[in-house]
Regions:
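Hydrophobic/aromatic ligand-binding patch that stacks against planar heteroaromatic rings
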Residues: 154-155, 185
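Alpha-helix C-terminal capping segments
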Residues: 155-161
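Extracytoplasmic ligand-binding site segments that recognize negatively charged/polar headgroups
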Residues: 172
Length: 342
């Protein structure tokens, strides 16, 4: 009897081991690893698979499709921390989605839905460039949701066409850099800071002392340079002279209707109208609409804790008491409405 139970247990253990082995093999097959050699050390990084979810079925049997991509929230190159670690799309995730859509021959056009107040200058510029690059291959229609302001509008300028809702808040064409000065507070509490620099402008944004006039002029020049690039991109994209744009390119936020009147967008409508326009531009009248989603791997589930601990990347931390707005980094240039920088 004991021998029978022993054989049964052995068989069950063997079956369990075979099952685990097969499942692990399937997992490795599904997990696309990007393997690279660095100084003789092999490193593997998981590539995120972008799976498709049907948003609108095709009107007739066809393989043609329109891809819907979302750009939501503050545009940042930094990793979101804490509760919102996966809440915001990264620059890389947007680029990957655009690249996959361009590479897929069945995709006839792209609809990029933007619901963002803007964000970092460089991150916005990178996504704008990716959108512009994609638009050279396939039509890209931007649909502006509740807000596509500042950096959000900057990104939209890379598209083939722009559709906005009547109530969309957009434009806010401008640049902002903030720093906090606490030198008087230091004096009141008896604190002081000694700084050693290699040049007169190395600590221009230090809050430990008042800024000199030449430092203010220096920082303002940086802002002006970035603003001029922003204005130039809008002018080229929309075919509107810079002088004409300056009536609305002073940092103000405008509605979708006002944006249409100022030639900042092409038409008023809803996301369904953006789909319809994409079908026309892509010459795919019966195309369905799909949305990309990330396949969560085991590495994502585990959070790649060891890698994150080793890299210690910069993060944008959220303060739940302040309306879910990120704390902006002092001295970093942003394409944001002023109200988002407070």
């Amino acid at each position: 009897m004991n021998k029978k139970y022993g054989c049964l247990i052995a068989l069950l253990l063997l079956a369990l081991l075979v099952s685990v082995g097969l499942n692990f093999g399937q997992f490795l097959g599904k997990l696309d690893l990007d393997v690279g050699m660095d100084a003789g050390i092999a490193t593997a990084h998981p590539k995120r698979h972008l799976r498709e979810t049907v948003v609108e079925t095709a009107k007739k049997p066809t393989q043609d499709k329109i891809v819907h991509i979302d750009l939501e929230g503050i545009i940042s190159s930094m990793e979101m921390g804490g509760l919102f670690a996966e809440a915001m799309p990264s620059v890389d995730s947007i680029k990957r989605a655009l690249e996959q859509a361009v590479a897929d021959k069945k995709v006839k056009a792209i609809v990029l839905r933007i619901n963002s107040p803007g964000g970092e200058v460089t991150a916005s510029d990178i996504i704008y460039n990716a959108v512009k690059k994609a638009a050279k291959e396939k039509p890209v229609v931007v649909y502006m949701d509740s807000m596509a302001a500042s950096g959000g509008y900057y990104v939209a300028c890379g598209a083939t066409k722009i559709v906005a809702s009547e109530t969309t808040l957009t434009a806010s064409i401008g640049v902002i850099i903030e720093t906090m000065n606490y030198s008087e507070l230091f004096g009141k509490v008896g604190l002081s800071m000694t700084t050693f620099t290699s040049g007169a402008f190395k600590d221009s944004l230090s809050g430990a002392r008042p800024m000199r006039d030449d430092e203010k002029a220096y920082v303002q020049n940086l802002v002006t340079q970035m603003y001029d690039r922003f204005l130039g991109i809008v002018s080229e994209s929309r075919g509107v002279p810079k002088d004409q744009l300056k009536t609305v390119a002073d940092g103000r936020v405008v509605t979708g209707r006002e944006a249409l009147d100022a030639k900042l967008v092409d038409q008023i409508g809803y996301v369904e109208d953006a789909y319809a326009l994409a079908r026309v531009l892509g010459k795919a009248a019966d195309a369905g609409v799909v949305k990309y989603r990330h396949e969560v791997s085991l590495f994502d589930a585990l959070g790649m804790a060891s890698a994150k601990a080793a890299q210690q990347p910069a993060k944008v931390q959220f303060d739940l008491s302040s309306g879910l707005l990120p704390k902006l980094q002092p001295g970093v240039p942003y394409f944001l409405p002023p109200s988002y920088a407070r």
